[in-house]
Each structure stands twice: as structure tokens, then as C-alpha cells.
Amino acid sequence: MEEKYLPELMAEKDSLDPSFTHALRLVNQEIEKFQKGEGKDEEKYIDVVINKNMKLGQKVLIPVKQFPKFNFVGKLLGPRGNSLKRLQEETLTKMSILGKGSMRDKAKEEELRKSGEAKYFHLNDDLHVLIEVFAPPAEAYARMGHALEEIKKFLIPDYNDEIRQAQLQELTYLNGGSENADVPVVRGKPTLRTRGVPAPAITRGRGGVTARPVGVVVPRGTPTPRGVLSTRGPVSRGRGLLTPRARGVPPTGYRPPPPPPTQETYGEYDYDDGYGTAYDEQSYDSYDNSYSTPAQSGADYYDYGHGLSEETYDSYGQEEWTNSRHKAPSARTAKGVYRDQPYGRY
């Protein structure tokens, strides 16, 4: 066989028209390989020390002959091809659906099959899935085994398995429709929330304590979370303590506000300090004496610039503030420090 192969290649090369450039190139490459001895089958070894990446491929037959009415290609692809994409990402492999029946347009598939192009040779084979891995030897075989185990689930002709239900839910979500009771929920997977449906809000009771949602049954024996009041059983209280529902009782942990700081500097109410010295007994004596003795002349009344001091200014301010002219004159005599007439001359 090998003796006849090289002469056949040489004869085919001579018979080819020069316009077939790609065919001539391929024939020349094949002749060179055979002459160098690369065409012989050699034993393949795996070097795990160098751990060089290797290419591993395997064809998995799709059982369309046993189950001709089941759409295996649709189940493998999923909505918008997402199922096959996720399967490749999970197994870290490359998967391709090839063979007869892999294309939707049957007329175009037949046309491409008859075209004779190398990339369409797979259309002559049975429908299959090509799994390819490019990784170090140990990891490559591990990925291939994982891929074979996972793709087996997609080759079971079941219309109501978990994969089919998940695909129906995903298709409903992608179409923008609302999920109804006709689409069952996949076990072990969360239900998809449709658009426009708000998330359940967490209600808070009085005092900031988180309350349980209405209709949620808490199993018996479950510990109550911190900060949540238990709804079953009476509220236990110690002897002499008020119940939490009593009105007027401050909540637990309540601290009274600290007393207001004393005014030490001139602030918002600093005008009180200006009138604070006018409320002693000596000031009242000077007010009464000034009103009990009338002014002698107009000059005495207007000549207030002479002998002006802080004590007289405070007394004048208190005169308008307290209006002491309706009081009876004090029986006590004024001391020598104060004058009988605050606006009189010396």
C-alpha cells in the first residue's frame, strides 16, 4: 500500500491543472511528509514531566436514529445558544454540533455537502458533537471526562427534566413575559423574578425592631434572630418591672438627655448679665430716692453728662425695666456711696 501511495501522488500532481493552487499545495505537502517518513504511524507518548499542552478530540454520537422525533439539537443549544455556551464554560472545552442534520436549512446543507469543500466534509457523517480540549495531559483528560459526563444529560430524550424546565424559564425571561403557573420551578434553582415585580420589603415595627413578613411560618425550635421579637408565648417580666406595652415607659436602653451647660461666656442670653446687678437692695434704694425727690430745674434734668458712672447707668436701665415709681418709698436711708439725685450736679 505504501509503495503504491507515492507514485499515485506524483501522478495526481502531474495531472492537476496549475489553476488549482490549493490542491497542488496539499499534494506537495503530502509528498514531502511521505518522503521524510512522517507518514508512518508512530507510537505516541505523553510526557507528563514537561507538561506540554496537547490537543484532545472526541466525537459523541447523538442518538437521532433511536429517537428520530426528539429535538436533540435544540436541547443542546438552548435559548439563543446559551445552554451550549454555559456547558463549554463549565467544562472548559470546545463543543461543536456537526454531521448530517446539524444545519436548520436542509437545502443549503445538501448544497454545501455536495460542494466538496474540506470544512463541510463533516456533513457526510452522522449527527454528533465534537469535543475538543487543548491543555496539559492530565488536565485535558480530566476535562474530557467531565464534558462526557455533562453532555450525557443532554442526550436523554426527556421533555420534562430539569434542563428542559430551566430552558423554558429562561426563554420566558428573555421574551420579557411574566412567569405563570404553567412553567414549573426547577428544583434547587431560584425562581426568576419578572420585570416590574418589586422585591419583598422588610418591615420594621415600632422602635426599629425588624418584624417577620406576613404569612411566613417559622419552624418550632428555630432560635429567634437578634433584634426580632418573638410572637409566641407570653412576655416574661420580673417582679416589680413594668411590661413593655405600658405607656409612658421609655424603651430599653433609653438614656435621659444631659443637662444643658451653664452659661459662662457671653452667648445668646448674655443680656441677663447686664441687668443682674440691678436687683440688689442698694439699687432699689437709689431708684426710690430719685423718684421721691423731684428735679430742681430743667438744667438739672438735661445735664446728665457730669458724674456719669456704671452704677447710674444700671440704675437708669432698671428704672424703665421695673417701673418702680408706683412703689412706696423705702424707709431705709441711702448710704454715703450713692447720691440722692443721680442726675444732680456736685
UniProtKB/Swiss-Prot annotation:
Its main location: nucleus. There is a cross-link at K4 (Glycyl lysine isopeptide (Lys-Gly) (interchain with G-Cter in SUMO2)). Changing Y141E: Fails to influence alternative splicing of CD44, NRXN2 and NRXN3. One of its GO terms (cellular component) is nucleus. SUPFAM superfamilies: Eukaryotic type KH-domain (KH-domain type I). Residues 61-127 form the KH domain. Keywords: Host-virus interaction, Isopeptide bond, mRNA processing, Nucleus, Phosphoprotein, RNA-binding, SH3-binding, Transcription, Transcription regulation, Ubl conjugation. Phosphorylated on tyrosine residues. Isoform 1 C-terminal region is tyrosine-rich, but isoform 2 lacking this C-terminal region is also tyrosine-phosphorylated. It is found in: Nucleus. One of its GO terms (molecular function) is RNA binding. The keyword Phosphoprotein applies. Ubiquitous with higher expression in testis, skeletal muscle and brain. Expressed in the kidney only in podocytes, the glomerular epithelial cells of the kidney. Strongly expressed after meiosis. InterPro entries: BBP-like (IPR045071), KH_1_KHDC4/BBP-like (IPR055256), KH_dom (IPR004087), KH_dom_type_1_sf (IPR036612), Qua1_dom (IPR032571), Sam68-YY (IPR032335). The keyword Ubl conjugation applies. GO terms for biological process: mRNA processing; regulation of alternative mRNA splicing, via spliceosome. Residues 1-160 are annotated as: Involved in homodimerization. Self-associates to form homooligomers; dimerization increases RNA affinity. Interacts with KHDRBS2/SLM-1. Interacts with KHDRBS1/SAM68; heterooligomer formation of KHDRBS family proteins may modulate RNA substrate specificity. Interacts with the splicing regulatory proteins SFRS9, SAFB and YTHDC1. Interacts with HNRPL. Interacts with RBMX, RBMY1A1, p85 subunit of PI3-kinase, SERPINB5. Interacts with SIAH1 which promotes targeting for degradation. RNA-binding protein that plays a role in the regulation of alternative splicing and influences mRNA splice site selection and exon inclusion. Binds preferentially to the 5'-[AU]UAAA-3' motif in vitro. Binds optimally to RNA containing 5'-[AU]UAA-3' as a bipartite motif spaced by more than 15 nucleotides. Binds poly(A). RNA-binding abilities are down-regulated by tyrosine kinase PTK6. Involved in splice site selection of vascular endothelial growth factor. In vitro regulates CD44 alternative splicing by direct binding to purine-rich exonic enhancer. The proline-rich site binds the SH3 domain of the p85 subunit of PI3-kinase. Belongs to the KHDRBS family. This is KH domain-containing, RNA-binding, signal transduction-associated protein 3.
